[in-house]
Each structure stands twice: as structure tokens, then as C-alpha cells.
Amino acid sequence: MNPGPDYLSVGKSDLPLMYMVAGLCFSLALTVWTTLLILSRGNLFLIHFLMWLLLLFKTIQEFCNALTLHFVQTRGHPVGWNIVYYLFTFLNGSFMFIVILLIGAGWSLLKPFLQQREKKILTIVIPLQILSNIASIYLGESAPGTLAWVTWRDIFTLVDILCCAAVLFPLIWSIKNLRESAQEDGRLSFNMLKLKQFQHFYIVVVAYIYFSRIVVYLFDATVPYRLDWVSDLSQEVATCVFYVTSGYYFRPVPNNPYLAVSHYDEESEDEETASFGIVK
């Protein structure tokens, strides 16, 4: 039994502070990204503003989580902060998959429109994310071990796996198109730079999915109860690294590979459109 007015278990008593620190880290990342947007007005795409919005949702989510756990720890109930936390968890979770999908599809970076198959993926991911967040809320508010809890846990796991798989398809298609374009036209060096960039981003996405869905689960299932915070910490570190790495790859600077190719392609827009099969 914990000494003093601490209603959290021993392994979770440090979580309020940890999430507050995580919120500060994401606040710093948001400040840096905002500065980049201000200083690089001539190199901006719409996706950069969506990435900014994603960072904002993530930052607010971290602070709401910290406040929720703080009040649970000191008063035994979240004083309504859990509702705000669930709202921004939904916004952040849904927006993260949408942004990954749009970056992977090359939307606003390679082309101004989504292809029909990419639109279909998007219409699948959004409802799945709504279902995933409903399951997450139920799991957070109900007693573990009941039949209903186990059912919603299985639904959450299945839906999460489907979303993770779905967002990879547009990225794979973009890599395939870039590879074919690099082999067929005379702009090999330009397209190879962009191809390598998307290949690296694919590796980062796969590594993040593997770590956050498998390694974190193994931590949670194997560490002693006094170290329950380790899985939460590893999840936050992985997410922070993923956000920072993604921002670095697609930052709005003149020497970024996708921007260099975009400027080059303005002289032959019709050829580029045919190469990528853009549909309105």
C-alpha cells in the first residue's frame, strides 16, 4: 500500500511527472516546427501545416494525460480531465494515421491530388480509428478481466493492426512509382534522392509500428509491477523519436530532396502527371 494520498499503484506513481515532461518535450518540438514554418514560407506545403496540427494535438494530449493521472493520484478521480484527454487522444490518434498516409502517398509533396485507391484507404482508416478510440475509452473506463473488456481489447488490437497495415500501402506505392520514374526518365539523380527519402521514411514507420505495438507490449507483460512505468516511457520515447525523425525528413527547407525535385518538375508538369497517374 502506497504511503500518503497516492491512489495510483506503485508502478504508476511517477506517470504524472513523466507525462508532464513528455508534454514539455513535445511543446519544444512544436515551437521548433512553428519557427521552421515562419522562416520557410516560400517552401511550405499544406502537409507541413497538418504536421503542425498533429504536434499540437499530441502536446495537448500529453498535458491532459498528466493532469488526469495527477488528480487520480491525489483525489482518486480525474475531475473531468479524462474527458478532455480522450478527446485529444482521438484527435491525435486519428490525425497521426491520416498524416502518415498523406505523406506516404506524396500528397502535396509529389502531387496535389490523391489517387482513387489512396482515397479508399483514407475512407477505411478514418472509421477504423473511430472504432479504435471507442474501444480505447471503454478499456480505460471499465474493469479489466470481464468478458466485455476482453472483447473490446481484441477489437482494439485488431483495428490497430489494420490501421497500421493500411497506412503502409500508399508509401509502398509511392516508392514503386519513384523507382519506375527514376529508371524511365532522364532525371535519375533527382528521383533517386526522393526515392531514398521515402525508403528511409518507410523504414522509420515500420520500426515505429513494430516497437510501439510489439516491444512495448512485451515490456508491459514482462516487467515487475514496480516498473510498470517502463512501458509507458518506452512508448513516449518511441513516439517522440518518430515525430522528430519524420519532421526532419520532410522539413520545409530549400535543400530538401522532395522540394528540389518539385522545383525541377515545374518545367515538365505534364510528364510528371503522366508518370504518377494523378487523378482528380
Describe each region flagged by the PLM.
Residues 1-131:
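Hydrophobic alpha-helical transmembrane segments corresponding to the first two to three helices
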